[in-house]
């Protein structure tokens, strides 16, 4: 996710769900190196970021795009043409450099490593194969691209970058419940009249995230069961 500051001063977080996979966009660490298949799911993206971050350092990455990619796809909260990046540059949300070296300086990225990374990625884009992270090799990757294409070079300046930080979409810890969504006490017995669903309930996925929106199905299912149970109890009371 990236942190957006609006003109009002309000801050919000923007999820980077799609544009990571578009041609002309890559993600790098402050050391200037790629660390992930950018077209993989956001869950895998952040898992790779956490794994690549040295102990004690802040997990962060930079999402980079050249002029063509920004104009066509946008970058995070910065929208594509016909919008211009002026407002996002003014707030500091976007960083810009006429060259990769200038952009690296703006973002405190290792300039030499970044130049090597972009050159290597551009070679992959021309060859049609990412031998480092296999971006575009899966149907999922290609579905996130532009008409099945996810590899594209970064060649046309100015170049742009936005800072990426880990965010959360759901939880894997919460109140223990039974199959009726009744909250359990320390003896694993239902607490009368107390239910929990959604992110308040201990996730049935137990820390895994097999698919986008995976928190929604269980919330709807157990919400239905709770409603059904309560309706039955009210019927008996009447």
How would you describe each model-predicted region?
Residues 1-238:
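Residues forming the flavin
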């Amino acid at each position: 996710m990236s942190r957006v500051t609006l003109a009002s001063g309000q801050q919000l977080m923007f999820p980077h769900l799609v544009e990571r996979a578009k041609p002309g966009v890559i993600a790098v660490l402050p050391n200037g190196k790629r660390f992930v298949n950018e077209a993989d799911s956001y869950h895998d993206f952040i898992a790779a970021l956490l794994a690549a971050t040295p102990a004690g350092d802040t997990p962060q990455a930079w999402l980079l795009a050249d002029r063509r990619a920004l104009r066509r796809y946008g970058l995070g909260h910065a929208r594509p043409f016909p919008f211009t990046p002026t407002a996002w540059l003014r707030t500091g949300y976007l960083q810009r450099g006429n060259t990769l070296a200038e952009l690296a300086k703006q973002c405190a990225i290792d300039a030499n490593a970044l130049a090597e990374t972009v050159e290597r990625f551009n070679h992959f884009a021309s060859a049609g194969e990412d031998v480092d992270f296999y971006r575009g090799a899966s149907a999922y990757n290609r579905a996130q691209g532009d008409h099945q294409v996810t590899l594209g070079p970064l060649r046309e300046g100015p170049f742009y970058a936005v800072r990426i930080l880990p965010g959360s979409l759901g939880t894997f810890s919460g109140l223990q419940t039974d199959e009726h969504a009744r909250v359990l006490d320390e003896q694993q017995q239902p607490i009368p009249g107390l239910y929990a669903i959604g992110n308040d309930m201990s996730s049935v996925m137990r820390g895994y995230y097999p698919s986008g929106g995976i928190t929604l199905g269980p919330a709807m299912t157990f919400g239905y069961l709770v409603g059904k149970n309560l309706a039955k109890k009210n019927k008996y009371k009447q």
